Amino acid sequence: MSREQTLKLYLADLKKDYDYILIDCMPSLGMLTINALAAADSVIVPVQAHYLPLKGMTQLMKTISKVQRQLNPNLKIDGVLLTLADMRTKLARTTEDSLRENYGKHIRIFKTVIPVAITAAESSAAGQSIYEYDKNGTVAKAYAEFTREVIQCGEKQRNKHESSLSR
C-alpha cells in the first residue's frame, strides 16, 4: 500500500454507509490533499476571490491531472466554488470574471458565491458550524444555496447516467 492510498483504504469500508463523504483539506498540495484526491470520487475546488488563489488554480489542476493519471483515474472535478468574496470590490469581480473566462469552458464554475463575513471566522473560532452560529446570515444562506446547487447537479448527472444505461 502506498502512502497516497491510506485514506482511500480507510474510507472504502465507510462508503457503503453514506451517500456523501466530505473531505475538507487545507489549501496546500501536501500529502493529506493528495490522499484526499486519491480517495475521492469527485472534487469541488474552493477558490478565494483573490489574486494568488486564482493563480494557484494552475498548479492545482496539474496536481489533479497527475492524481488522475497515477492514483485515481476516475476522479472528476464537479466544479469550482468562489469563496471569501466581497463582490463590492473590483478585485472580487475581476477574480470571478477571470475564473469563468479561463476555466469555465472546461470546468463548471458554480453560480453560488460564498461571501466574506466575519461570522464565518467567528463560527470556526467558536467551534460551531455556520448554521449553529449564524443560521440566518449571508454565509449560511450562501452555503445552503450551494448545497442545493450541488444536489441539483448530482441529480442531473445521475439522470443522464441512468438514461444512457437504458439505451
What are these model-predicted stretches?
Residues M1-I23, S28-L29:
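Cytosolic-facing regulatory segments adjacent to core modules
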Residues D13, T33-Y51:
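Inter-motif core of Ras-like GTPase G domains
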Residues V47, L54-V80:
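Anionic-ligand binding region
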Residues D86, D97-Q128:
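Beta-strand-loop-alpha "switch" segments that mediate conformational coupling across diverse proteins
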Residues S123-K141, E145:
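C-terminal boundary of histidine-terminating zinc-finger modules
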Residues S163-R167:
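Non-Sec secretion/translocation targeting segments of pathogen effectors
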